[in-house]
């Protein structure tokens, strides 16, 4: 039996979530962004009406409003988006128990062997899409193939509300004519390198000798070569939320960034989510890990040990310090991630920090119970009145 893998990609997720509770946003340019009142922050999501004006995710709000002055802007409500994401995943579990959530708005489904239940793959995808639209008020695109890579490529081919099948037998006619720039995993730096060698399409890369692909891009080149030939045996992996060895968040940027002001805003947004999750599960971690993936797909992981904490600002300050140390202003960043691990039993007395950076250790946030009380108050207000009722001034980009 051949595998059947779906990639369900929620379209313009954050702003689509907002549209489910505010119908006035439907049909007009709208976006979720940092601070609508002060016209500061960055665009986290824009609907398709706004995108027609050139508005893109990660663009500064000020620039976005220059492109589309009539755009309606709403502040982010991450708790609400997590709730809607959970609703999506619960709905998807009706169709298969084998689900790998890759981000808040994407998941792979192993639909192998479900044809007797839901019909052919395209029919099953239509059922899922209509189920999500009718019951949750959200839009999605679904890619279908034998593997995760091709299903991901397929999901990008038709948005919004698209269903695309991309089987191995079709790669020469459907995949190979596409620009190498559109290949999942190829960033700006990689594209520049391949373009300089006359490699313009995925087919051009697929027709290289395997050794040449390796020589040009190293191990990453071999991965791309296999993917260009439809070879991907990576299984869909079910990750249990109960097996919590770490709490992390990451985001792939739609545009490569080098501006530390934009990156630190995104970092703090991720840390807000991590901190709230850690407090919800009463998990204090001692290791903060920062992940940066550059536009040429080199990945660095840097970590530091601090006093056990679930305080948002302590996690953020550790991550930001690592970001300042390891961000190269000449190398654009494609992905940024942060996590906390090394959880300790809250009944165990806190240990002395071995975070050996004198300047950092002098910061007021480290070991400051006042910040934990602030977190608790903010969590309480958000849980009772909504995430948009209170925000940190630190989340504003001036």
UniProtKB/Swiss-Prot annotation:
Location of the UmuC domain: 5-187
Active site, renumbered: 106
Main localization of the protein described in the UniProt heading: cytoplasm
GO cellular component, one term: cytosol
Pfam families the record matches: IMS, IMS_C, IMS_HHH
GO molecular function, one term: damaged DNA binding
Compartments where found: Cytoplasm
Gene Ontology process terms (BP): DNA-templated DNA replication; error-prone translesion synthesis; SOS response
The enzyme's E.C. designation: 2.7.7.7
Keyword annotations: Cytoplasm, DNA damage, DNA repair, DNA replication, DNA-binding, DNA-directed DNA polymerase, Magnesium, Metal-binding, Mutator protein, Nucleotidyltransferase, Transferase
Gene3D superfamilies for the chain: 3.30.70.270, 3.40.1170.60, 5' to 3' exonuclease, C-terminal subdomain (1.10.150.20), DNA polymerase, Y-family, little finger domain (3.30.1490.100)
Sequence similarity: Belongs to the DNA polymerase type-Y family.
Subunit composition and interactions: Monomer.
Function: Poorly processive, error-prone DNA polymerase involved in untargeted mutagenesis. Copies undamaged DNA at stalled replication forks, which arise in vivo from mismatched or misaligned primer ends. These misaligned primers can be extended by PolIV. Exhibits no 3'-5' exonuclease (proofreading) activity. May be involved in translesional synthesis, in conjunction with the beta clamp from PolIII.
Record protein name field: DNA polymerase IV
Record organism: Alkaliphilus oremlandii (strain OhILAs)
